[in-house]
């Protein structure tokens, strides 16, 4: 895979340039565009993944299915499909926005800052997973309500963006409705 960049955003969330992904994620991370996707199987179970220990930010932490950054000239939907294939080796369908205006800023234990405008989507897996171990060290298919209980009981075990997304009542309701259809 070629070197990834992030799309930098101005104060109005409009693209203002690009920066190499690893150079962007520092102690002073500029605002940039990202995405987050919650992937469900045909039984309505949620794929929860554990970030590889080689990840720069939040290594070894459990998170929602897949996250990443659209490249310049790429739609968010195209980026989600690309990262699902790269990280999980999976094809998806029924890509649906569930929290289109989510943004957050969080600092990991090593001081690395995430500062993202990060629309949240749900999607359905249509093929068997083929996990890229450089991205994902573990994974589990779980009932959404069970994951929600775990998020409430042990939020420190999960990525802050996952906790924040699921804590939004409207987004949580949309995810629950999505997994039940």
From Swiss-Prot:
Pathway: Isoprenoid biosynthesis; dimethylallyl diphosphate biosynthesis; dimethylallyl diphosphate from isopentenyl diphosphate: step 1/1. Keywords: Cytoplasm, Isomerase, Isoprene biosynthesis, Magnesium, Manganese, Metal-binding. The keyword Transmembrane does not apply. Mg(2+) binds at residue 87. The active site is at residues 67, 116. GO terms for cellular component: cytoplasm. PROSITE patterns: NUDIX. GO terms for molecular function: isopentenyl-diphosphate delta-isomerase activity; metal ion binding. One of its GO terms (biological process) is dimethylallyl diphosphate biosynthetic process. Its cofactor is Mg(2+); Mn(2+). Homodimer. Belongs to the IPP isomerase type 1 family. This is Isopentenyl-diphosphate Delta-isomerase. The gene is idi.
